[in-house]
A protein has these predicted regions:
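Beta-propeller blade termini
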Residues: 32-41, 50, 84-91, 138-146, ...
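Beta-strand-rich domains and repeat architectures in extracellular enzymes and scaffolds
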Residues: 23-58
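Hydrophobic beta-strand segments that make up the repeating blades of beta-propeller
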Residues: 47-51, 99-102, 154-158
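A short beta-strand motif characteristic of beta-propeller blades
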Residues: 19-26, 71-77, 117-131, 185-191
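Repeat-based blade/solenoid architectures
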Residues: 24-34, 77-86, 127-141, 191-195
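A short loop-to-beta-strand structural motif that recurs across blades of beta-propeller domains
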Residues: 60-63, 107-109, 174-177
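Glycine-aliphatic tripeptides that mark coil-to-beta-strand junctions in extracellular
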Residues: 43-45, 72, 95-97, 150-152
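Short glycine/acidic-enriched loop and turn motifs that connect beta-strands
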Residues: 52-57, 105-107, 160-165
Length: 195
């Protein structure tokens, strides 16, 4: 029995050490927490993380890495930093979870988990979200289906005009929003104080 456990420990150690990998992406920082979901159907959890630099376009706004070897599955550009943590739900019924991630400049994106193609963008390129009083989207959370489309919907906060000086007391309000996960449309929106 002692040899069984010794051999088991040895083979588990070899298997676990073979699963280590690292990946390097040039010229971005991240405040996004890495999240995992199987995006390529191989049974191994893959890693999704947002990135970028405040107020700058990034070619590496959101990246998905293969959980087996750390190779890049796909990446998407972003008009500003994506600092939210991804959540996952199969929105296009292909059997693979899709990615919802958020960040500055009212970026809230739904991305096909398998291909990396954009499913919807709350504020597409070429629009100025601040003109509508919307600023940063923070970490999204799923809630029960509100709009009756059989998909869990998104509860998310929006606010924080970080370009305003810290001493400015007359700030635009924040919003607590319910967003359709299927198409990115606003279902409900409530004004909340912003500090």
């Amino acid at each position: 029995m002692k040899y069984f456990f010794l051999n088991l420990f040895f083979f588990v150690s070899i298997f676990c050490s073979a699963q280590n990998w690292q990946s390097f992406t040039d010229s971005i920082g991240t405040f996004s927490s890495a999240r995992s979901s199987d995006l390529n159907g191989d049974g191994i959890m893959d890693i999704v993380i947002g990135g970028g630099t405040d107020s700058m376009f990034s070619n590496n706004g959101v990246m998905a890495y293969n959980g087996v070897d750390g190779s890049l599955l796909w990446k998407r550009s972003s008009r500003d930093e994506l600092f939210g943590s991804a959540i996952f739900q199969d929105l296009n019924s292909d059997g693979i979870n899709d990615v919802i991630i958020s960040g500055r400049a009212a970026q809230l994106l739904a991305i096909d988990g398998y291909t990396g193609s954009l499913l919807w963008d709350f504020f597409p390129f070429g629009t100025n979200p601040a003109d509508s009083g919307l600023y940063n989207f923070y970490n999204p959370q799923f809630i029960d289906d509100v709009d009756g489309d059989s998909f869990k919907d998104i509860l998310i906060s929006n606010g924080g005009d970080h370009s305003a000086p810290s001493f400015q007391s007359n700030r635009p309000p924040g919003h607590l929003m319910v967003i359709s996960a299927q198409d990115g449309n606003i279902i409900e929106k409530a004004v909340v104080p912003d500090s």
